[in-house]
Each structure stands twice: as C-alpha cells, then as structure tokens.
C-alpha cells in the first residue's frame, strides 16, 4: 500500500532510537524540537492556515512586525476552516472561509484567528475558553470539531464544519507517483500513515501507488504526477456514500533523460529538521520514488545549536547506499556543513564523519567563525566528497556590485565561496534552491569568467519533516542537477565524477541540450582565433519563455518561445579569445514548477585558444570587491576566540585575492 509507517525493526538501532527521540521532541515542542528557532515555532501554526503566505510571515517576524504581516495575509477567500475574529472599538466582527467537511463519527480541526486593534490587552472566549489577546496583536486558536454546530466566539456564532458521509477512494498509477486529493471546498485528504505536506503553490501532496484513503462523499479533484519529467494528470470523482471509488491516472511524460545518459539528483534534502511531523527513512524513500528522482542526498545538519539532525542516520550509513537503492535510483546520507556568516556547503559521497558539522552558532559547541570553511572543504575532499556551496545569495545582485549579498550578516549566504573557489576547494555551486536564481547566476558567471571550473548543481534544501514551507515543504527533487554519466551505470561515484567534470545542468523544470562544435557541458574545445563554432541549444519542458546562449561577455544568442514549438537556438560563435558558453532557460511562474520562476542553466562548455587561460578583468575586480566586503563583515560581525582565529580566516581571503589580482 506504500503508506505503512516507518519500519523501525529494519533500521539500525541508533537510527531507530533517533526516530523515537524525534517523536518525543515533536510531541513536547511542535515545530521547534530544540527550542532554538522562535520564528519557526511561532510561524508554523499560522502557516497551516495561511498556506503559501507563510514565507512572507516568517520574514516579517524576523523584522519584528508579526501582527501586521498576519493581517496582510488575511485576503479573501479565506481557506476552509479559518475564522477571523476582528476586535476594535466598534466591537467584534467575524468572517470565515467555507466550513470544512467532517466525516461521520470523526473530527476536523478548525482555527479562529483573533485580531485585536484595541490599544489594551483583552480576552475573548472561544468555545468556552477565555483566550488572552495582546494589545494590537493576533492570536491563533485551534479546535477539533465533530459536527455542524456553531463555534461560539465572543458571544457570536462562527461556522464550524459540514458533516459528510464516508466513502473510500483507491488511487492507482503505473508507478509510484505524487498525488493530491481535494474536495470542492479546498479541503485536503490523505491516506493514513502518509505525511501530509503542501507544495509551493499550496497544493496538498503525498506519494505512493495503489493507495486507499477515506474521503467525504462529495466532489473530489485528484491529480497525479511524477516529478519534473512528467505533466500532471487530473480527474474529478464523486464517490457514493458508503462505497469505494477507484481512480487510475497516468501522467504524460514530457521528456526522458536516463535514456540519454542524464540522471537527475537533489544534493540537499533534510529528512528531519525540527518541524511539525517526524519523517522516517521509509517516508523519504516513498518521496524519492514518487518523484522519479534518480539520486537523493539526505543531509545531516544543525539549525542554530549543537543538535545535528539526522546525525545518527548519517554516521550509521556513511559511505553506503540506503536500503531502497536499485539500479534506477540511489540514496545516501551526507552532511551540510553550516556557518551562517561564511556560508553552507554539502558533500556528495562523504564516506566518514567530519571533525565538525558546523561553526559560528552562538550557544552551540562551535560558537566561533573558525576554522575557515576552507578547512572543512579540504576535509570533505579527503573523505571522498564533492564540495558544493548551497543557496549562495538571496538577492538579484542587480546594482552591478555584490553589495546586496552583505546586507544581512548571518543570512546563510555563501560569502566564503568566492575565496574557496579561487583556492580550488569547490566543485559546484547550487543554482537552484531556496535562493535568488538571477543573483546566483550573476555570481556564478563572474566565477566562471575567472576560469574557475565549477559545475552547476541543485540542492533544494527541503525539510521533509515540515508540512508547509512553502519552498521547504516542496517534494525533494523540485529542483534537480542532471548529470551526464556518459554511459556509466548510476551510482554515487559516477554522479560525483560527473559533477567534478562539470557534465551537469541545474533546473526546476526545463531540460536543456547544449552542443558547441558537437561537445557538451564540461567538455573543452581547443580553437584557433577567428574560428566559428557551431552551437545548438534545445529545450524541453513547460513554462519557458526565453532561451539564451550566454558567455563571459553576456548574451550571445537568444530566442523567445512562441507558437507552441519548443524554443531552440542554432548559431555560430566566433572564437576571439578563451571563453565559456552556457545555455539558460527562463520563464515566469508556472503551475508545474514549484518555485517563483522557471529557470534552468547548464554548466559551461570551455573554449580555449592556444591554451591561454580565461581572463575577464572586470569579473576579477567584481570578485575582489566581494572579498573586501567579506573581510569588512568579518571585522564587524565575526565571532572569534582571539586575533589568531580571525587572522586565519582573513588569510584565506588574502590567498584568494592574490589569485584574482592575476586577472586584473
């Protein structure tokens, strides 16, 4: 049935004990198991009702204006089951979303959001309980209701629930898939034992095949997909009371990469990362299968204290494939090394326990911004892993300088990436993930233009233990790095070799094909000055509006999609000097893409003239500006035990400066 609970008896003892401890922590402190993230703890219950508005709410909470942000999210239509009770000098006003369905003999959760515009604290009675509300503040109250009776709120009656007869629904596809079942009031329905989760577009989702679930005997919408290589199949069904209805769907394939030797992976997935539910290995396996994801790296990582989530699972399995690995898919545990000032990076193929899992978190066992990330990069390399910096920047870097990447000190942006890449310690940069794709591309292009051979990769940073994110509760693999294995069977080692060689592309939907004189990403072409190189770029997938061929001097060729045909470029590029060439696809938001925009970017094909190195002085100066700002930020915000520690990190920056100055 694909929705059995995690089989603890098949887990290594330390992993089973870890899972049990997380269940206890989640019961004791939902959404913030370690007592280390007030923003997530406060925001998570609201996100259950505000859906995709959660991200804005969390950012506003960090800015200290939580009530105003919550109010900005209360636009019509309100979701089913949410009642907003507004208090001001004129009294109490209620407005509500549709009453949710409640199955006969069951219960359903509803919420009352108390929104006070009074200048003094007050109390309001909700379903017989007096609830304190701060002056000018908001308070969320939830209740489990069993019937249609009204919900008393401050002497008024709010709608509670609509009773509905029980029915059963059976779901089948040709393979494990991602499903969604919603009723005509927007309510979501899940099989017992499956973790309830919602994607970026606030659509409920679960994974499996041949599934059964209890549903109301009302009109239902069912969708089925299998990750970005597939379209979405949809149907409606109205099961009869007491009966069982069967739905069989098969999503159409948009493109197939494995047949061409390209395999898709997600290098940055958190199985457990605090949250409102606990994810077990079986849950993670179902998600990988249902997304058609060839490779998945589950990373252990801390948040802000000493606890490293999923550390026991990593240490019990380090260097070994997980139990559900086959010839068509592979999964491993690894580590995300985290310093919020210097940056975060992940390692694909890590074979052993590193000396440190994190640094620079005040209140943890590693409070100082030392040693430099460069030391951890070297250790990951010694332990067999690739090094990939993740979520590099959160702004578009649109002003021509790197200033926006230094606006917030501990923003988890990849400040040390520029130094570590110059020292040859980095293999890849995540162009897809919870970061700004345009700003990341700006940074990536400057690095390439200094001859740094970095692969384009993807690490989504999804948290499987969160029901709503919105990006963080997306399914794993919503963004992927596709690696050209050149006929080698799928394995972690083969995938890592492709990353090191730059035979990759990063995407959240479209699949790109780039050939320069018959050579693909990662390849090197020896050319003579003036030679004209034929270039073809193809693109498959949904939502692309513009296709570009780019190099160190900008856009070399472009086409806009139109007329229903797949966009393509057929051009010639003159080899005037050594260069890199990449293909890029862009588009606005699209229902099939689980992010704000459509984006794909290949790693480069390298064109070398008589072995001369690639040099673009303007990019070197831009990266030197980055390093200057990084050093200034260390001086102002770095935490060090002594001047020697600070000098060691600054020494890494100075080594990188010498490299970039060679190009000016």
Q: Which role fits each region the language model picked out?
A:
Residues 2-92, 111-204, 211-215, 225, ...:
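Charged catalytic cores and adjacent phosphate/nucleic-acid-binding surfaces used
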Residues 89-111:
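Beta-sheet-dominated interaction scaffolds and their linkers
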Residues 99-101, 207, 212, 268:
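Asp/Glu-centered strand-loop micro-motifs enriched in Gly/Pro and often flanked by an aromatic residue
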Residues 105, 242, 333-335, 365, ...:
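Glycine-centered loop/turn motifs
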Residues 162-163, 236, 245-299, 615-631:
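An acidic-aromatic substrate-binding cleft motif
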Residues 218-222:
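A short tyrosine-centered beta-strand micro-motif
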Residues 262-456, 460, 465-468, 491:
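Catalytic cores of extracellular degradative/oxidative enzymes
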């Amino acid at each position: 049935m694909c929705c059995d609970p995690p089989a603890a008896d098949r887990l290594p003892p330390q992993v089973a004990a870890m899972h049990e401890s997380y269940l206890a922590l989640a019961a004791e402190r939902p959404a913030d198991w370690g007592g280390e993230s007030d923003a997530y703890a406060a925001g998570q219950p609201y996100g259950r009702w505000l859906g995709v508005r959660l991200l804005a709410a969390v950012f506003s909470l960090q800015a200290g204006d939580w009530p105003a942000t919550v109010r900005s999210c209360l636009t019509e239509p309100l979701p089913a089951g949410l009642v907003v009770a507004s208090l001001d000098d004129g009294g109490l006003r209620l407005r509500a979303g549709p009453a949710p369905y409640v199955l006969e003999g069951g219960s359903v959760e509803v919420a009352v959001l108390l929104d006070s515009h009074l200048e003094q604290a007050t109390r309001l009675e909700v379903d017989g309980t007096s609830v304190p509300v701060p002056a000018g503040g908001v308070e969320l109250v939830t209740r489990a209701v069993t019937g249609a009776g009204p919900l008393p709120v401050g002497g008024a009656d709010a709608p509670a629930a609509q009773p509905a007869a029980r029915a059963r629904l059976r779901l089948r596809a040709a393979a494990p898939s991602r499903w969604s079942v919603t009723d005509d009031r927007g309510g979501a329905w899940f099989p017992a034992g499956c973790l309830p989760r919602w994607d970026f577009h606030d659509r409920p989702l679960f994974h499996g095949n041949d599934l059964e679930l209890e549903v109301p005997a009302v009109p239902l919408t069912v969708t089925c997909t299998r990750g970005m290589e597939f379209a979405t199949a949809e149907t409606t069904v109205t099961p009869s009371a007491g009966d069982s209805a069967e739905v069989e769907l098969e999503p159409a394939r948009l493109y197939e990469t494995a047949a061409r030797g390209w395999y898709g992976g997600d290098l940055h997935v958190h199985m457990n990362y605090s949250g409102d539910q606990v994810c077990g290995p079986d849950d993670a396996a179902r998600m990988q299968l249902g997304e058609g994801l060839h490779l998945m790296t589950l990373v252990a990582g801390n948040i802000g204290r000493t606890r490293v989530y999923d550390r026991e699972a990593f240490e019990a399995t380090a260097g070994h494939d997980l139990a559900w690995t086959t010839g068509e898919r592979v999964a491993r545990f690894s580590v995300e090394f985290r310093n919020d000032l210097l940056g975060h990076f992940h390692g694909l193929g890590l074979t052993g326990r590193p000396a440190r899992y994190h640094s620079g978190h005040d209140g943890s066992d590693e409070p100082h911004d030392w040693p430099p990330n460069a030391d951890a990069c070297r250790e990951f390399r010694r332990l067999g892993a690739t090094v990939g910096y993740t979520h590099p920047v959160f702004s578009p870097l649109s002003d021509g300088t790197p200033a926006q990447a230094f606006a917030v000190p501990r923003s988890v942006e990849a400040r040390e990436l520029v130094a570590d890449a110059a020292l040859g310690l980095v293999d890849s940069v995540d162009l897809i993930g919870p970061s700004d794709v345009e700003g990341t591309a700006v940074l990536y292009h400057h690095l390439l233009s200094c001859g740094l051979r970095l692969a384009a990769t993807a690490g989504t940073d999804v948290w499987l233990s969160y029901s709503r994110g919105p990006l963080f509760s997306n399914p794993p693999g919503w963004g992927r790095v596709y690696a050209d294995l050149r006929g080698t069977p799928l394995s972690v080692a083969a995938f890592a070799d492709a990353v090191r060689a730059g035979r990759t592309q990063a995407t959240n939907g479209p699949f790109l094909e780039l050939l320069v004189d018959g050579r693909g990403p990662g390849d090197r072409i020896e050319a003579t000055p003036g030679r004209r190189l034929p270039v073809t770029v193809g693109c498959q997938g949904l939502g692309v509006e513009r296709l570009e061929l780019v190099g160190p001097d900008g856009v070399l060729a472009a086409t806009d999609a139109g007329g229903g045909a797949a966009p393509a470029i057929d051009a010639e590029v003159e080899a005037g000097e050594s260069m890199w060439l990449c293909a890029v696809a862009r588009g606005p938001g699209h229902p099939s893409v689980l992010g704000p925009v459509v984006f794909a970017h290949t790693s480069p094909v390298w064109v070398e003239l008589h072995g001369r190195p690639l040099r673009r002085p303007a990019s070197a100066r831009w990266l030197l500006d980055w390093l200057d700002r990084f050093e200034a930020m260390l001086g102002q915000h770095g935490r060090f035990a002594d001047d020697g520690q600070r000098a060691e990190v600054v020494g890494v920056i100075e080594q990188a400066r010498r490299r970039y100055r060679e190009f000016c």
